């Protein structure tokens, strides 16, 4: 089976690429992309959020078969230490990270929101960010999304699903 992950065609060994295998485990165990986290396994927490064709999906319940022929983007492609995505920069400015476990999923959900809505209201943010943060940084997350939205509006670049980047960007591999 072949997947398009972070702009690169990735061949998965047929013996390991069960079509029912959750995308999360293919990313982490077969491709070594460990920025996407396992939290609950039932699509409730959002730690495993990635983009599939530009939409935020919970990879823990998304079978490989469902992403065949589609574009998968993980946190590793959101930005780089040299050139962080405006969301990553805003996350730091607003001091969002505490334990950090949910951050990659939160960032990916926020990136999907801003790609579709450049100026989200608090209600839009609350509706789009259904991820769970056990540290309770929701007000900071909302502030960071508003900060990033403003930064993106000031730049000439519109938010899209991220392009491939350095794997150790904020919220990336650990």
Sequence positions of predicted segments:
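Signature of N-terminal electron-transfer/Fe-S-associated modules in redox systems
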Residues: 1-174
């Amino acid at each position: 089976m072949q997947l398009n992950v972070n702009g690169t065609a990735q061949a998965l060994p047929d013996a390991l690429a069960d079509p029912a295998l959750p995308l999360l485990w293919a990313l982490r165990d077969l491709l070594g992309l460990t920025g996407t986290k396992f939290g609950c396994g039932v699509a409730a927490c959002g730690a495993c959020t990635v983009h599939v064709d530009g939409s935020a999906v919970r990879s823990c319940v998304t079978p490989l078969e469902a992403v065949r022929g589609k574009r998968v983007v993980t946190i590793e492609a959101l930005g780089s230490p040299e050139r962080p995505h405006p969301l990553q920069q805003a996350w730091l400015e607003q001091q969002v990270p505490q334990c950090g476990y949910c951050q990659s999923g939160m960032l990916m959900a926020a990136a999907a929101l801003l790609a579709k809505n450049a100026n989200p209201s608090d209600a839009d943010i609350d509706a789009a960010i259904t991820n769970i943060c056990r540290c309770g940084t929701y007000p900071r997350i909302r502030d960071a999304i508003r900060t990033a939205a403003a930064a993106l509006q000031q730049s000439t670049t519109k938010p899209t699903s991220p392009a491939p980047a350095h794997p150790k960007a904020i919220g990336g591999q650990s």
